[in-house]
Amino acid sequence: MAQITTTDANEFSSSAEFIPMRGFSNCHLQTMLPRLFRRQVKFTPYWQRLELPDGDFVDLAWSENPAQAQHKPRLVVFHGLEGSLNSPYAHGLVEAAQKRGWLGVVMHFRGCSGEPNRMHRIYHSGETEDASWFLRWLQREFGHAPTAAVGYSLGGNMLACLLAKEGNDLPVDAAVIVSAPFMLEACSYHMEKGFSRVYQRYLLNLLKANAARKLAAYPGTLPINLAQLKSVRRIREFDDLITARIHGYADAIDYYRQCSAMPMLNRIAKPTLIIHAKDDPFMDHQVIPKPESLPPQVEYQLTEHGGHVGFIGGTLLHPQMWLESRIPDWLTTYLEAKSC
């Protein structure tokens, strides 16, 4: 059975425990605050375009030139829906890795680096092929070094699926999954209720803008036209018309059920830390796995507060991005022990 950890605001503070910023424990404030405190990328990224076997590409944002850092431990970040290096959690963690002497990299999903991808496909919560190919390319190109993968939200569900599918064959030493929607169908309904509809509208606008850019650059590469795209009102409708159809699923519900990581979690073989907040406004209790469903190598941490990929502690004058210490601290055992 997995190790289950809960944190409470009254407990003694350490990097393993999350205490929300005083007066700002509200889930929506926690979700939104990172964009206030982590507005700009504070390092100069080294960009690289990786051509894929099918003629498409993904863009990589490194903390430094990887050819000059082959010996360093590696931390790979998989972002969330319409995320990128500019997402506060992504560049914040890469910067934290850089400060520890590690090589950090964000693998942008297809079409998420600012330039539309070429092929008749996009990315989704269960699309593990690109991540798998990248991790193996990383090892082939730069040799063996301790490697960890971190997935946030959609990228977390994808990473969980990848870990489950490939088991010990996946070339990573450990993984961390944050705020992942392990039950996609339930989360899609939750996003249509109450204040969560604000997040749905925001994300849907990003999805539609990205799809419109793709249609303009590569006409005919999506199964709908611009007029149909403009009429989409819900993420589930977007997934029905585009995500499911372009990737061979019957509809959005079929896609959600086939790509939800929850039924696969018991197959994870690599050491993995999963972090959820009870008050995550993007999802409900159905994403919380049962302890008996998790293998011993999975540690599950459920916090009372934190919102969705928030977890802001400290004070307004001195905010603390808890994930930027919690994740590297947990991974140190796997990355630095083998790099000596």
From Swiss-Prot:
Keywords: Hydrolase, Serine esterase. Residues 73-312 form the AB hydrolase-1 domain. GO terms for cellular component: plasma membrane. InterPro entries: AB_hydrolase_1 (IPR000073), AB_hydrolase_4_CS (IPR000952), AB_hydrolase_4_sf (IPR050960), AB_hydrolase_fold (IPR029058), ABHD4 (IPR012020). Its EC number is 3.1.1.-. The active site is at 153 (charge relay system), 280 (charge relay system), 308 (charge relay system). It comes from the Bacteria. It comes from Escherichia coli (strain K12). Pfam families: Abhydrolase_1. The keyword Mitochondrion does not apply. Belongs to the AB hydrolase superfamily. AB hydrolase 4 family. One of its GO terms (molecular function) is monoacylglycerol lipase activity. This is Putative esterase YheT. One of its GO terms (biological process) is lipid metabolic process.
